[in-house]
Amino acid sequence: MRLISLVLSLILFFSCTEIQDDPEGSSSDKPNVILIMVDDLGWGDVGLNGNVKVKTPHLDQLASKGFRLSRFYSAAPVCSPTRASCITGRNPNRMGIPGANSGHMLKQETTLAEIVKKLGYRTGHFGKWHLGTLTTQIKDANRGRPGDSSHYSIPSMHGYDSYFCTESKVPTFDPLIKPLAFDTAKGESLRYGWAAALENQQEVEDYGTWYWSGIEKRKLENMEGENTKIIMDQVLQFLEGDKDEPFFATIWPHTPHLPVVASKKYREMYAEYSHAEQLYYGSITAMDEQIGRLWEYLERTGKAENTMLWFCSDNGPENRTPGSAGPFRERKRSLYEGGLRVPAFMLWPEKFSGGEELDVPMFTSDYLPTILDLLDEEGKIPELPLDGMSVREILEGKVNERGKPMGFMHRNGAKSWVNQQYKLISPKKDAPYELYDLLVDPSEESDLISQSPEIGAEMKTKLEDWLRSVASSKEGKDYP
């Protein structure tokens, strides 16, 4: 009897010791989290939204396994601001990032990477950064200059253990170089793109935007070929790290942001189309293959079931490109639907069976509160004015409407307020307000402002309250 009591005491002791050592539960039980955001991909540029030209089989398949988010919005109609919203849950104007190549991620902001790192996650960022300069020693990209630290803000300042990224855009093939001359007869140019230069033995020079993987550490080796493959090579190295820790990765490929460059392999997939379409569609298919490669790795290594993956674009398609906004009005840089509504899906096989379309408004500012809620870490949501909300109950099928409206603004003075049904918009500075019923008129063709002035007035009051809140944040009043 004494021996049995001793054994039971030892079992109880070691059980209690385990609980004391890991009061919040094993970090290995936490899901991996991946946020993929591509660049300038229009709502209509993917098969999952009905495009029959562009080949995106991997994106289509992943969307079919999860939730297709058919009313998903970027927080802004351009690049940098949307990126800021993804990792803070806040409108980018609150932190002084009103447009591309303006402002930078502030140290006072609390990012999703910082929060999950404290929860035991390994954190990595890959691809485009666009939230600050990455060097103070050499000329780089749009704003990096020797001796200039005014916008120096690298991922490791904001919770990332590892990173491999550029300040801004690069060509979508052979990202570090550009040809000395372009085939202008085919419409090639430095701005819009070209066929892979080295395939034709063209003379080349540095493009002028570099990849960085540490403080003043440029990556110059193994930088040839498909840009998204180069990025994914680094992602997979990161994922091969400590197997006992969950990972959080933001993967932001540059495709199909200009200049679009495609190799012969991908151009030939679209031989029946124009040269511009071959470059544009080819770059998207190349990117799609690499996202498929990522998921295949996760399945092969047994990580896929417990990985939460989100996919979206940072804004609508660029003007004067083959990009498609689908049935929606206007494109990038506009607060009409075509500038903000983007292709998106989410899957987490272990938790959600998926296979559904969710026709509920969501946007990139929802990422932070939603992910922390799904991790059962709502208490870690920053006590700052957030513009996003947790959409966990929508994903779980408990509610089918958005409870918190979404505010939008752009540096040209445009502003907008969107709820479950209606959209109020002033499309540029001092322009009169327009009102659309997005449930019956998603293409924004019938302005209802004169028919429903009371709805417009109520939404205008809420929009103006929100704009005052954003202005207060921009003045630094959110920070101690």
Where are these regions (language model features)?
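Formylglycine-dependent sulfatase
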Residues: R2, C16-Y433, L438-P480
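Bacterial N-terminal signal peptides
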Residues: S5-F13
